[in-house]
């Protein structure tokens, strides 16, 4: 399960690309979007069709790029807001396991809603999870909610597999150029920090949008690995808008390689 203590940290993007990485590695993989109040899978995978129902009134997952996909957004049309009480949310959560024909899978990645609500409670009572990954950004508010999520998984005896830090930094690359000025003695500073310049005056700089090291410190506190640090990436954002995971559209991209390493770490845990 891929979880987060709060919304807006990129949990669904992480879950989608992790599932894509496992699929590309040759595993039979499913992705279940359990965020009933705000399903995103129809948009992030560019899917408009509804899932089919077989003769036994069981739902057939939508298949795209060898991924078996299911989301409440496929059923609701992803249009009207969902205003449901806890028991109805719990019932729908169970149906995604009982009434969906997943078939044989190596991995079923669950994209949980943020927080510690009805879906998480239902899973802990009804569905045995092999483990949970918590997604966070490196700022204090998100990290505080990580602790709440970790405590919840601990109480329901679900192993915590690790932490993924999203939006860790922004990679800034450039080159100083001038047609009429000698740049041999020029120095570059960003936020009062001197930036190293190559001989050709090019540079690479990691700009931390939030504080540095938040995810690492939290993973150490929880005694679990920091599985990956995902930089802020325009390519990653655009891939979501296009409805195609970056891991599928450009598996050589530096961010895709991070997702591949996270998938590899999961494979090693479940050999």
Language model features with spans:
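Phosphate-binding/switch loop-helix module in NTP-utilizing enzymes
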Residues: 73-123
């Amino acid at each position: 399960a891929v979880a987060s203590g709060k919304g807006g940290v990129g949990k669904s993007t992480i879950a989608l690309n992790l599932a894509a990485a496992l699929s590309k590695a040759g595993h039979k993989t499913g992705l279940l979007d359990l965020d009933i109040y705000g399903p995103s899978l129809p948009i992030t995978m560019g899917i408009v069709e509804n899932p089919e129902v077989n003769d036994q009134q069981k739902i057939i997952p939508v298949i795209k790029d060898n991924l078996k996909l299911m989301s409440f957004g496929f059923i609701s049309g992803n249009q009207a807001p969902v205003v449901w009480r806890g028991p109805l949310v719990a019932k729908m959560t169970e149906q995604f396991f009982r009434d969906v024909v997943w078939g044989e899978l190596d991995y079923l990645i669950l994209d949980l809603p943020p927080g510690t609500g009805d879906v998480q409670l239902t899973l802990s009572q009804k569905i045995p999870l092999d483990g949970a990954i918590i997604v966070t950004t490196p700022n204090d508010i998100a990290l505080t909610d990580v602790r709440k999520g970790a405590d919840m998984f601990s109480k329901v005896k679900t192993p915590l597999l690790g932490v993924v830090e999203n939006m860790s930094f922004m990679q800034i690359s450039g080159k100083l150029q001038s047609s009429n000025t000698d740049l041999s003695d020029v120095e570059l500073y960003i936020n009062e920090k001197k930036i190293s310049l190559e001989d050709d005056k090019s540079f690479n700089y990691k700009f931390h949008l939030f504080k540095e090291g938040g995810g690492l410190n939290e993973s150490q506190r929880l005694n679990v690995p920091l599985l990956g640090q995902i930089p802020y990436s325009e390519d990653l954002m655009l891939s979501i808008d296009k409805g195609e995971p970056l891991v599928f559209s450009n598996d050589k991209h530096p961010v895709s390689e991070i997702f591949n390493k996270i998938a590899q770490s999961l494979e090693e845990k479940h050999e």
